[in-house]
Amino acid sequence: MKSIGLNLSGREYKILIGSDLLAETADLLKQAIPCDRVVVITNIDINRLYGKKLKKHLESKGIGSLFLELPEGEIHKSLDMASHIYPQLINHFAERNTPILALGGGVIGDLSGFVAATYQRGVPLVHLPTSLLSQVDSSIGGKVAVNHGGIKNIVGSFYQPRLVISDISCLKTLPEKEFACGMAEIIKSAAIGSSELFKQLETNTPAIKDRSPEIMEDIISQTAAIKAGIVCQDETDRGIRNILNFGHTLGHALESTSSFSQSHGAAVAIGMCFASRLSVKLGLCENETVLRLEKLIADFGLPTRPQDIDPEKIIDAMHHDKKVSDGRIRFILLKRPGEPLIAENILRADVISILEEMK
């Protein structure tokens, strides 16, 4: 098991990464939060895979549990769904010291975090991420949010968990499409934070696709450490944390304009290709960087170009993004793997030009 610590203005928590950690949840939980009951928020599929075993494990350690099973999908990450959860917490007498355990992927983590942040002005939150994307990205850093009015993550806050337990054994049951989506965030982290990790992904693609436990624990730990290091420098996304949005400016617009039928990982993959091409157009990086990035993305079964888009609608969606500042769309561009930069004064014509080029 590997442990990564985050220290945020005196608040500390750990990200634990290893095999079969769900079977150790109670002991790990008690070390962080003394408790005798918890609320577990999950979805139908994850509950079927892990819910019964986790509930039995918690009970064997003297921890009672209420499991709330939600529908699957990004469309349910909403204020309506949060409003569905609050009465159940009230009816079961969940208190301010009753931890909420988010058992699932990014949607469950974001929604559970939002509920934990707002119920009784904040209750303890523990992430049990079961998807690759949530293990390397969404469970780390304290961003909690729901979608509203067709806009991705427009209602939310920063609310740090008390503990993250990433059981890489859960990746065995992850569908190929979801595994690829998680790889998009790993590629993103390598592109902005580590040329060495980028090379490692290029070199070890077959073993990673085979989900070798040793390699997965290593690259998940490296990716989590990259994000943790950035978050510790800029918890509330006012400066350097912006670089974690590489690929996300276009990515979120693609998700929103598709009514969230476009997966997050696929949208980010396309967004990274767009941002790297824009970087070349602006003379910031060599075309070789684009070729390496697009090949790596394609090698993991992710798209490199958008399908059936209207550039004007995409730009309008970008203007609703929370990364907009003073009316200017903020892009994270790339000089080379490991060297990102933040840019705001990008001409609309250049954005449209690259979108047309990629159609």
Curated annotation (Swiss-Prot):
Record-level GO cellular component terms: cytoplasm
Pathway connected to this protein: Metabolic intermediate biosynthesis; chorismate biosynthesis; chorismate from D-erythrose 4-phosphate and phosphoenolpyruvate: step 2/7
Catalytic activity: 7-phospho-2-dehydro-3-deoxy-D-arabino-heptonate = 3-dehydroquinate + phosphate
Species name: Dehalococcoides mccartyi (strain ATCC BAA-2266 / KCTC 15142 / 195)
Gene name as annotated: aroB
Protein's UniProt keywords contain Repeat: no
Keywords: Amino-acid biosynthesis, Aromatic amino acid biosynthesis, Cobalt, Cytoplasm, Lyase, Metal-binding, NAD, Nucleotide-binding, Zinc
Superkingdom of source: Bacteria
Record GO biological process: amino acid biosynthetic process; aromatic amino acid family biosynthetic process; chorismate biosynthetic process
CDD domains documented for this protein: DHQS (cd08195)
Root EC class: lyase
Protein EC: 4.2.3.4
PANTHER family, per database record: 3-DEHYDROQUINATE SYNTHASE
Essential cofactor(s): Co(2+); Zn(2+); NAD(+)
Positions of Zn(2+) binding: 185, 248, 264
Protein localization: Cytoplasm
Xref: Pfam families: DHQ_synthase, DHQS_C
Family indicated by similarity: Belongs to the sugar phosphate cyclases superfamily. Dehydroquinate synthase family.
InterPro entries tied to this protein: Dehydroquinate_synthase, DHQ_synth_AroB, DHQ_synth_fam, DHQS/DOIS_N, DHQS_C
Name of the protein: 3-dehydroquinate synthase
Chain residues that bind NAD(+): 72-77, 106-110, 130-131, 143, 152, 170-173
